[in-house]
């Protein structure tokens, strides 16, 4: 098999993804990154008292790989808002990693007050373990997805391999970087984006789609366990000709390192990526943090929360904010998981479960 799988364990405190961090960091992939943000020092509040009676409340947001900058900004703003409105200090801890790995951590006992993961299937997996209600997606607007993204290609300045669309990723001599769909939610969006393109190109032929996607993955040089790790491999380590990436991650790379180093190629057809959010009922009931946790997620839908999402290159749901940032996001023909794959449950079972299509294509 022409690629290696990079898997590491451990945790570090996350640093802001600045230009210095990109160029000087070790690039080690981590299963969890923890950031303390908000006002005041971290104070444990894990007890059964109601959060409304506490002067300081601590939340843990377990999120997927590329949301570090988003929630670093959002947590500070939410803490200020909540302090002014309710007189409480809120400290938010962040844990980041591949979405699938993060979901398993919550299932295994990581006490997340809220989860903000890459795809609904990962939160459904937590729900199946009775940690939150089955109808969790109905609690907030837009199926509990306050912002969206899509999948694009990041190439080096001048686009030396002439990458224009998904077909170019199958060509001999093109080195592709993408994360491992067994551990990364972003990687599953990447994979289904390629599969959906192939279906539309080849009159819905599953065999042709399998052949097409298989050829892309034959060109993959490294499969990191998460989207940020894949970005580090491409951007910092200089490996690969093209990175299949979240749009927000590609735009952030340009912002941090400059358009003189990288270009973004938007494919003719891509997938509507909808990363959802949810309160983990079992944890907030135990800790007495339900009111704050619910307010935290609701604030994502506020105009200020939507502004923060847009500034961090996520496509906002709010029409007013979306119009303001329209020039930032190119128009692209999008399809959904429901339209082409019958929903995440079917897509997961067919493609990513043990023994599924991905394993069939890449077993040694």
Protein language model features and the residues they cover:
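Extracellular/periplasmic juxtamembrane helices and adjacent flexible linkers that interface
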Residues: 284-364
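Bilobed "Venus flytrap"/periplasmic-binding protein-like clamshell domains
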Residues: 68-73, 182-211
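Short, low-complexity disordered leader/linker segments with a strong preference
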Residues: 1-58
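Residues embedded in well-ordered beta-strands
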Residues: 152-154, 263, 276-278
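N-terminal segment of the mature folded domain
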Residues: 50-183, 326, 362-363
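Ligand-binding pocket segment of bilobal, Venus flytrap-like solute-binding proteins
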Residues: 202-268
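Short helix-loop capping/hinge motifs at secondary-structure junctions, enriched
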Residues: 158-164, 183, 196-204, 283-291
């Amino acid at each position: 098999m022409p690629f290696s799988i990079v898997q590491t364990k451990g945790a570090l405190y996350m640093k802001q993804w600045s230009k210095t961090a990109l160029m000087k960091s070790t690039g080690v992939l981590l299963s969890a990154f923890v950031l303390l943000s908000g006002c005041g020092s971290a104070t444990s509040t894990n007890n059964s008292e109601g959060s409304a009676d506490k002067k300081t409340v601590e939340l843990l947001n377990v999120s997927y790989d590329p949301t570090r900058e988003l929630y670093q900004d959002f947590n500070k703003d939410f803490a200020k808002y909540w302090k002014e409105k309710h007189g409480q200090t809120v400290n938010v801890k962040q844990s980041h990693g591949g979405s699938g790995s993060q979901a398993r951590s919550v299932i295994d006992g990581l006490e997340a007050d809220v989860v903000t993961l890459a795809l609904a299937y990962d939160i459904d997996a937590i729900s199946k373990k009775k940690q939150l209600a089955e109808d969790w997606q109905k609690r907030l607007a837009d199926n509990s997805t306050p912002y969206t993204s899509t999948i694009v290609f990041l190439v080096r300045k001048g686009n030396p391999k002439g990458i224009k669309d998904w077909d170019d990723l199958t060509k001999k001599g093109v080195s592709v970087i993408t994360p491992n769909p067994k551990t990364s939610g972003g990687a599953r969006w990447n994979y289904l984006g390629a599969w959906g393109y192939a279906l539309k190109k080849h009159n819905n032929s599953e065999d042709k789609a399998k052949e097409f996607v298989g050829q892309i993955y034959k060109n993959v040089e490294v499969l990191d366990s998460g989207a940020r790790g894949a970005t580090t491999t491409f951007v910092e380590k200089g490996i690969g000709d093209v990175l299949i990436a979240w749009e927000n991650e590609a735009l952030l790379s340009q912002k941090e390192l400059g358009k003189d180093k990288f270009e973004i190629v938007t494919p003719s057809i891509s997938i509507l990526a909808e990363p959802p959010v949810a309160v983990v009922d079992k944890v907030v009931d135990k800790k007495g943090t339900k009111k704050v946790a619910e307010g935290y997620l609701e604030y994502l839908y506020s105009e200020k929360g939507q502004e923060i999402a847009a500034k961090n290159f996520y496509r906002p749901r709010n029409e007013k904010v979306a119009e303001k940032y329209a020039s930032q996001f190119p128009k692209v023909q999008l399809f959904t998981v429901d339209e082409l794959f019958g929903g995440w449950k079917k897509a997961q079972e067919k493609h990513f479960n043990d023994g599924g299509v991905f394993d069939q294509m890449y077993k040694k």
